[in-house]
Amino acid sequence: TILALMIGIGGGVGTMMAGILSDRMGKKDVRWNMWLVGIVGIVAAPFSVMGYLSATGQTALLWLVIPTIVGAFYFGPTLAMLHTLVKPEMRSLASAIMLFINNIFGLGIGPLMVGMMSDALTPRYGVQGLGIALALMVIIGLWGSVHYLIGGRSLARDIAAAQAQAR
């Protein structure tokens, strides 16, 4: 119950924070719309790992405060950049594709991978197998964060090209 409240309330706060920060920083340099998401993901990763590997539920909840707040940080800036880069008549389809991929991996393949790793790790590590499996999944989040940083480097050029194509 506590974790669900943390995710719900923290996710809402984080989503709003991301929108505000991304808009503010993006006015100075549009690349910050992507860089912000990448940096926040990298900063949150160690907190996630510590939470997943914690010995007690209370300690895990404390470590997971930051990751629950920034867990949905990517959503607003990502949709904004997606809508900026595609033609107006393609925004609905682009959003649908992004949400489809997000759900396939986030709600389908990701949990399946965690379960399979947990099953494989439990004979050796006991009840810690699930925590280790979750901690290993942080690597995928870091990989995504690095790609936000890389994507940010060419974002201004990509936006200019998209706007030129729209004319």
Outline where the language-model segments fall.
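Multi-pass alpha-helical transporter architecture, strongest
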Residues: 45-55, 135-167
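A membrane-interface helix-boundary motif in multi-pass transporters
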Residues: 32-35, 116-141
